[in-house]
């Protein structure tokens, strides 16, 4: 399998095989399973968050000759203890694998559960230091059993990477890479926090002197560890042999991928099944589903074929089948099973005839997915079981009252969060049989049970807050409270944020530039305003979310903003405020700037492809440039702004040669390239690769991501393979070469 981003749910190893690609967590899960299957001890190593860039990563360690050796899962290098992440790992602050059962080795224990022990292996990858945190009350007395969270700034939030509890002397410790973290301590509703610099601060005293309701802002500068990778040597012979083996492995994978349905094959199959009875747009959707299902396409075909019974018409059952497929995520299409699809299709909605419009029929369809659980069949069996038990002795007038089901869950399901140590959701039928569950699995069970009853109503888990909600008879959302066995509308206010644009950020993005979190049990919990289908980083924007106001539950909140510099350092600002019912709260969204350091100003997908002028096949920017920084340009041949830019770069050709990183110069078309004469610009560095921007895709991506004019060339960016853009220029610019080199020197 090869790398491709996807959503946060991790595919099983066999599902990843059927897909032939996956994100790093799936690649490493697959590789660990494969090694263990042939008797080689292996474990997944995970850094919850990098400190120097907005991302995380997972890879593999394997045991050989008495030692653990790391490698890049499905991206193996010629030798062990080498991977593309080698340099980033040297800037890591925390890395941990899970060890089965109890563990008494030399590594620091991060978490101990009845099933596994989580250990800290950061010492194997980066220089480290230990720091001791002492938590006191407002009077300076040590506080025992205080919760201490060590947080890294990442994706515009302070993310908890380690949680400890203080001893009788109020102390807790952590060993980490030599960079900055935020330490957050809490107990009995009071909290306190401060920055700690590992390697500089060996001790920190932290008072619980903050409380809910205080309004203020706090700027903070955070510096990640410096890079210090010790890269093992790879001989040319080793590299050549590795390339040969990779090519062979690619051929095996590609032979399997060739068995998946192409768009043409899918279209032919759909046309044969439905003829002219199905609307073209619905046909197109089904074609897309079959192609997107990868190695799971036979499951979809087996789902659609048996319900095709009328040659001259499309039944409601078939329409519902299409709606079910539409409700699935891209990953669900790749691993959903036939029994799941049939269970959700064949379990009828009792009130189906009462629902007047297609819109509401789709609303009450109640799709298979609830949260990030493994999809299982449950509707038919669960509905029959609930009717015979929960509602058997209930008066007819109350058989559709959600309070009956809420009260049953409160009384009959025992909550034990410790038993589910890995927090993998228990299936709805598993909860029904055991009557014991963690809170998250209980929530999923309630939604599953509610949906199974076939009522003209809806239940779900809110994606932003994680609350269980239902739709009442007046089509209003109500929060389910299992403590009181009630469902009621929450009290809300409005948050509005003002923003004065800085040079590099016109419309701040959620997760890239800011986040919101709500106070609960002494700490703040992130609100998830997600967009897209990747595991992290795709969010909405200030303009769409907060410029005109956003309704939020009453309570105490924190807004975190951050400007990521090219060095990896962050200029953050945290604003604390309260949302009151029926009122509008206005805060400033502050993006801090640095006058001295290079800043991250946008994103560019380094996996984007182009066609080199000397090739007939497309190639990614990443493959051309390797890991690190690079320059990408889209040129306007013969245009004065482009000529100026090329001459400025040629004038500093030696400087760019010394820098040594790749530059990819693209032309809008083959015809444009044929008009280009490099001899007109003597001195252009040899590190330039020329190519064709196929379908104008790279230019469009840069223009959209950087909010540029759609028609002006040239466009230049400096970016890196963490997809960070640190420089952009468009159109006529004098001294472009000097500007580029100024940024290069600041990296």
List the model feature ranges, each with a label.
Residues 138-157, 178-180, 401, 502-532:
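Short, ordered, surface-exposed loop/turn motifs in non-cytosolic proteins
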Residues 1-19, 240, 249-434:
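Secondary-structure boundary elements
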Residues 621-649, 662-666:
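Short active-site neighborhood of thiol/selenol oxidoreductases, capturing the structured segment around
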Residues 154-176, 522-546:
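Short, acidic Ser/Thr/Gly-rich low-complexity loop/linker segments typical of extracellular
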Residues 189-211, 564-592:
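Structured interaction patches on ligand/partner-binding surfaces of diverse proteins
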Residues 679-713:
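Short, internal strand/loop/helix patches
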